[in-house]
Regions:
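Conserved AMP-binding/adenylation subdomain of ANL enzymes
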Residues: 21-38, 46-85, 99, 170
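Conserved beta-loop-beta connector loops within the AMP-binding
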Residues: 172-193
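Conserved ANL (AMP-binding/adenylate-forming) active-site segment centered on the GW(Y/F)…HTG consensus within
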Residues: 133, 196-206
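Conserved AMP-binding A3 loop
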Residues: 1-22
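Short Gly/Pro-enriched turn/cap motifs at secondary-structure boundaries
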Residues: 160-166, 181
Length: 206
């Protein structure tokens, strides 16, 4: 899957079957995705969120997917009463909050709303819970590793945070100058180890 990354031209991230399967299995267990679920899917499938996170977990669990061409607030509002899960970017949730029809009644059948691909403002998290009674589950990942961290499905989901490392995934923050592991309060380079980590960039071994 191609990713723009942070510098230069797009790079092809080489993902193995093991990378994809291990992450999907972990997420299905962590988020308790089963064949009884119905996912509202309005994300692009040329991106890791829509393709690897949303589709792979649903296919592995045997869940139903309500696949939409693009995000349309009216279509989502219509689908919510018969769905149990939604994965989206923060703007999906702010747009839903702008609709008076979005309330506890329309989300009564939902069990989890998941957010990623961009930071979710704490204000949005709080407003969403106030309106619906649901606390959005925010997680963090990248094309090269799939998902790395997640707020808990059961337990306290802290607004403005992306939770803890996934099971079987090791994460540490290191100094870009020395490579030494930094204290929790310091900013540094994220280093990840696990079956979810990709094989490298296509034809770019450097």
């Amino acid at each position: 899957l191609y990713t723009s990354g942070t510098t230069g031209r797009s790079k092809g991230a080489m993902m193995s079957h093991k990378n994809l399967l291990s992450n999907a299995q972990t997420l299905c267990e962590l988020w308790q995705i089963t064949g009884s679920d119905t996912l509202i899917h309005a994300l692009p499938i040329f991106h890791t969120h829509g393709l690897f996170v949303a589709m792979n977990t649903s296919l592995l669990a045997g869940a139903k997917v309500r696949l939409m061409e693009k995000f349309n607030v009216d279509a989502v509002l219509e689908a919510l009463p018969k769905a149990t899960m939604m994965m989206g970017v923060p703007t999906f949730y702010t747009r839903l909050l702008s609709e008076t029809a979005f309330n506890k009644a329309v989300t009564a059948n939902m069990r989890v709303f998941i957010s990623g691909s961009a930071p979710l403002l704490a204000e949005t998290h709080i407003a969403f819970e106030h309106r619906t009674g649901h606390r959005i589950l925010e997680r963090y990942g990248m094309t090269e590793t799939n998902m790395i961290t997640s707020n808990p499905y059961e337990g306290n989901r802290v607004a403005g945070t992306v939770g803890y490392p996934l099971p079987n995934t090791e994460v540490k923050i290191t100094s870009p100058e020395t490579g030494e592991t930094l204290p929790a309060t310091e900013i540094g380079v994220i280093e990840i180890r696990g079956d979810n980590v990709f094989q490298g960039y296509w034809k770019m071994p450097e």
